[in-house]
Amino acid sequence: MQFAKMHGLGNDFMVVDAVTQNVYFSPELIRRLADRHTGVGFDQLLVVEPPYDPDLDFHYRIFNADGSEVAQCGNGARCFARFVRIKGLTNRRDIRVSTQNSRMTLHVGEDDRVTVNMGEPQFEPGRIPFKAAKAEKTYILRVAQQTVLCGAVSMGNPHCVLQVEDISRAQVELLGPSLESHERFPERVNVGFMQVVERSHIRLRVYERGAGETQACGSGACAAVAVGIQQGLLDEQVQVDLPGGTLHIRWPGPGTPLLMTGPAAHVYDGFIHL
């Protein structure tokens, strides 16, 4: 099986063309391939498939390193867009794709930076999903013998966002796993730790559901900005600094889609016997 290794700001992917190759991935095989010592090693596996809908260009599936399938990955979407152009599967600069539960339009710029229309952030608890009587800008959660304040939003996948004073001292390893599996998030959750530098600039670390802390999380950056805007902390256009690099997010507000722009790097092509 042929594959490519790619990354978006250090969030790394094994990308497989299932348009021209016949492939099947069991959770056990994915876990084996994800192992950084004995396999290929990656945060997520991206599988490019023919479109399920004739109005779209492709469908793509996203699997975490633990073998679980997820519905959204912002960094993965950017790598996906570059992959299908590099491999000659399309020459379009505007690419329409579906994922497990959403549709997106991806634009590949002249500089190979990719802008992803991530759709409108969803704050309604039932759509995240999050157990709450009604939507609030801030929720109080009891976790790891602490009381924390957080925002909750779906960007096609569930996110919990905490504001912290200093990102370097955030309790990512303590609060990340505890919040990820908190009982009020029935499908588990990605946890963002956001430091507001100014209204147009944040620093962010993300503990990803099924993957742990990563170098960058595109949907996590989108979620943090959406929550920050909803809470009145941020402006419409925000620079997000992650450990792996910088993303630019724009969200005019409710009723409009959120746009994420950032790089996607092709590292190497490989072949593996399954």
From Swiss-Prot:
GO terms of molecular function: diaminopimelate epimerase activity
Pathway linked to the protein: Amino-acid biosynthesis; L-lysine biosynthesis via DAP pathway; DL-2,6-diaminopimelate from LL-2,6-diaminopimelate: step 1/1
EC number of the protein: 5.1.1.7
GO terms under cellular component: cytosol
GO biological process, one term: lysine biosynthetic process via diaminopimelate
Site (Could be important to modulate the pK values of the two catalytic cysteine residues): 159, 208
Binding site for substrate: 11, 44, 64, 74-75, 157, 190, 208-209, 218-219
Gene3D superfamilies: Diaminopimelate Epimerase, Chain A, domain 1 (3.10.310.10)
Residues of the site described as Important for dimerization: 268
Functional summary from the UniProt entry: Catalyzes the stereoinversion of LL-2,6-diaminopimelate (L,L-DAP) to meso-diaminopimelate (meso-DAP), a precursor of L-lysine and an essential component of the bacterial peptidoglycan.
The protein's assembly and partners: Homodimer.
UniProt similarity note: Belongs to the diaminopimelate epimerase family.
The protein's name in its UniProt record: Diaminopimelate epimerase
Organism: Edwardsiella ictaluri (strain 93-146)
